[in-house]
A protein has these predicted regions:
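Short, low-complexity, disordered segments immediately C-terminal to signal peptides
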Residues: 46-74
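Active-site beta->alpha N-cap acidic-glycine motif
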Residues: 105-230, 334-335
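Catalytic domains of cell-wall/extracellular-matrix polysaccharide-remodeling enzymes
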Residues: 157, 200-298, 302-320, 324-325, ...
Length: 338
């Protein structure tokens, strides 16, 4: 039980990709990983079960003691019991495309109906992976879709597209965006929620080191009011290297490293910082992603970015067609730094 509790702490702090589980299911999934019984997890998991199991584990942030007791009492038996669903596909004992699969190295993945592959990593692998290794997913093609400045009136459209393709994304939140009530939907559907800025006023945010941290904490507190915790993943407004933060950047990053925050820039931009058509945004994305075996894609979620939403299905399809897996950013993800 202590190991399960530790893993629950990891998942609840970081979140993860995929479709949510119930609290009971999430605890059972974590119990399976903690006890090493990943094979039992496969029995009775059809496409829907696989998609749910793939990443809803971050919902254990709200797990109750009774849920933990369920894991303790049921052990692997509950996770391996046949599904009670009337869908015959859930009775398969051998996983097919669309069901949860656990490779030998400890990664679990599912392939959605659209052909997108989403990843859930075991807690052991998370602990074995660190930004300090400076290794960028050898042998794998990984795509991290990220949205700055949201949520907005476009958020539900974005979520609908992500769900259609069976992929998840990371939101870097603008605290005064006016649509923070969308955050629970983002979080509960298995996406990552992170800090961007509260005001996005560059001169104010970067006036001093203290001013930056005041803005960050104000944003984190606003997020916590919606989803119950303040994230530790961050994206600098304007990126970590910009025209406004040269005097304070070094001290801010040093303090982040000391206090457990992790910042992310990007290596692919869809170009929606300017006014472009959806086709142009797709073209910019493909041009920047060409030759990259892992991509952290910068996009924006705001009321004015309708063309970004229009371009999103084609952008996702490009990465699917080129063999990319999709994941959300975590504290141990390779650091995309300028």
């Amino acid at each position: 039980m202590e190991e399960i509790r530790k893993q629950i702490d990891v998942f609840s702090k970081e979140g993860h990709s995929g479709t949510p589980l119930t609290r009971r299911q999430a605890c059972e999934v974590l119990g399976v990983f903690a006890l090493g019984g990943v094979a039992a997890m496969l029995a009775g998991c059809g496409e829907q079960g696989g998609q749910q199991a793939s990443a809803g584990a971050h919902l254990v942030a709200s797990a109750q003691p009774s849920d933990l007791a369920t894991v303790s009492e049921a052990g692997l038996a509950t996770a391996s019991a046949p599904s009670t669903s009337t869908d015959d596909s859930t009775a398969q004992s051998t996983p097919a495309a669309g069901s949860l699969q656990v490779p030998a190295q400890g990664n679990a993945s599912y392939t959605s109906a659209s052909g997108a592959t989403c990843i859930v990593r075991s807690a052991d692998e998370r602990r074995a992976t660190s930004n300090s290794t400076n290794e960028e997913f050898p042998g794998r093609h990984v795509c991290f879709l990220t949205f700055d400045d949201g949520p907005s009136t476009n958020t539900q459209r974005i979520l609908g597209i992500l769900n259609e393709y069976g992929v998840r994304a990371t939101w870097f939140v603008k605290g005064n965006c006016g649509s923070l009530e969308e955050l629970p939907s983002i979080w509960e559907q298995g996406n990552q929620v992170a800090i961007h800025t509260y005001t996005h006023e560059y001169e104010q945010v970067y006036a001093s080191v203290d001013a930056y941290w005041a803005d960050l904490h104000q944003c984190g507190n606003a997020i916590a009011e919606q989803i119950g915790h303040s994230p530790t993943l961050v994206r600098f407004p304007g990126g970590s290297v910009n025209d406004f933060n040269a005097a304070v950047r070094g001290d801010i990053i040093a303090q982040m490293n000391e206090t457990g925050y992790h910042y992310f820039d990007w290596n692919v931009s869809c170009g929606d910082g300017a006014d472009h058509t959806a086709d142009e945004l797709v073209g910019y994305t493909i041009g920047e992603a060409d030759g990259c075996h892992s991509c952290c894609v910068l996009m924006h979620d705001s009321a004015a970015k309708d063309t970004t939403v229009d371009a999103l299905p084609q952008i996702i399809q490009y990465f699917i067609d080129n063999g990319f897996e999709f994941d959300v950013l975590l504290s141990d993800t390779f650091g995309y730094h300028f």
